[in-house]
């Protein structure tokens, strides 16, 4: 029966359409609901197509938009109950979905959405240092319309603008788009664009603690949020490196591995400095810079090869879209 498979369906699919009674669906999916950042969009439709109901993950999962699309296609009544939507207000998590931004903290998302529904004007502030700041500005303006203003500012400017928090009502709720670590407030929703990759090289049997320390030091130098990483990267011979894999699991990061044949042309093209020892050991003499650039599909390094105990780290800027 479907009940025996719904758990696997939740893991395998981003969108689930159930054509049956709403109550059946609620009971069936209840044990598998985790968090709005993980759950698939669930839409329910009656068997004759009169009503299409957005049940789960309306914003981040896109269930509300999917409900509208299905309803339009079959001439059904869409049923959407999220407060921002029924009041015709722009929810920041919808922009996050469209622009592939990560919600930094879900409690502040709740706080800011509540402020929007309560009639408060919520402005958007975009970090001027982002490579795609101009495009994000246009997307944010199109999203919020007349319900707020969009500002492209330096983080120094942002720090001087009051923000509402738990201890004071001074300032306003706001949405900030940045890949940098900044001060946190209860009514400041931070949306994280994916802007960089990190190439990592390490000696055989390097413990995860040394790799994690190298990662954290590199992030701290550039004030980068770990949530803005696209992927980590290394050479294929490190795909079974226990310390590296454990470090990735702790960081919650994906990692990709490149072969020496994939790396060698870029090393030559960009004239990347090679270590004779590393080249003699694995066939290429530059791991961290090369793999960071390959993963980023760019030629721009934010951090050149930096040597830490038994570990090397480089950071590349992702080509803006």
Predicted segments, located by residue:
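Conserved mixed alpha/beta catalytic, RNA-binding, or beta-rich assembly cores of soluble enzyme
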Residues: 1, 5-15, 19-22, 26-105, ...
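Short, surface-exposed, charge-dense and proline/glycine-enriched linear segments
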Residues: 69-78, 108-118, 254-267, 287-296
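C-terminal edge-of-domain segments
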Residues: 171-184, 188-191, 288-321
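C-terminal non-catalytic interaction/assembly regions of soluble proteins
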Residues: 217, 227-289, 296-301, 307-311
């Amino acid at each position: 029966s479907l009940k025996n498979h719904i758990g696997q369906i939740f893991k395998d699919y981003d969108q689930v359409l159930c054509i049956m009674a709403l109550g059946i669906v609620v009971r069936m999916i209840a044990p598998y609901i985790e968090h709005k950042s993980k759950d698939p969009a669930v839409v329910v439709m009656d068997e004759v197509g009169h009503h299409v109901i957005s049940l789960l993950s309306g914003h981040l999962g896109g269930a509300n938009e999917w409900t509208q699309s299905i309803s339009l296609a079959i001439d059904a009544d869409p049923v959407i109950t999220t407060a921002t939507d029924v009041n015709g207000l722009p929810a920041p998590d919808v922009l996050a979905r469209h622009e592939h931004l990560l919600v930094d903290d879900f409690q502040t998302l709740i706080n800011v959405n509540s402020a929007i529904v309560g009639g408060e004007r919520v402005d958007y502030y975009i970090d001027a240092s982002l490579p795609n700041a101009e495009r994000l500005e246009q997307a944010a303006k199109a999203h919020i319309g007349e319900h707020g203003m969009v500002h492209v500012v330096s983080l120094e400017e942002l720090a001087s603008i009051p923000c509402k928090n738990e201890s004071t009502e001074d300032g306003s709720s706001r949405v900030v788009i940045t890949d940098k670590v900044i001060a946190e407030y209860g009514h400041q929703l931070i949306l994280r664009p994916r802007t960089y990759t990190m190439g990592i090289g390490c000696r055989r049997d390097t413990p995860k603690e040394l790799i994690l320390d190298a990662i954290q030091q590199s992030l701290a130098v550039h004030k980068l949020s770990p949530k803005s990483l696209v992927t980590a990267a290394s050479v294929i011979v490190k795909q079974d490196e226990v310390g590296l894999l454990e470090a990735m699991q702790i960081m919650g990061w994906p990692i990709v591995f490149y072969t020496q044949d994939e790396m060698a042309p870029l090393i030559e093209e960009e004239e990347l400095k090679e270590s004779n020892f590393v080249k003699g050991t694995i066939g290429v003499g530059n791991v961290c810079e090369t793999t960071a650039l390959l993963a980023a599909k760019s030629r721009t390094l934010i951090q050149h090869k930096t040597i830490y105990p038994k570990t090397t780290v480089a950071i590349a800027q992702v080509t803006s879209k």
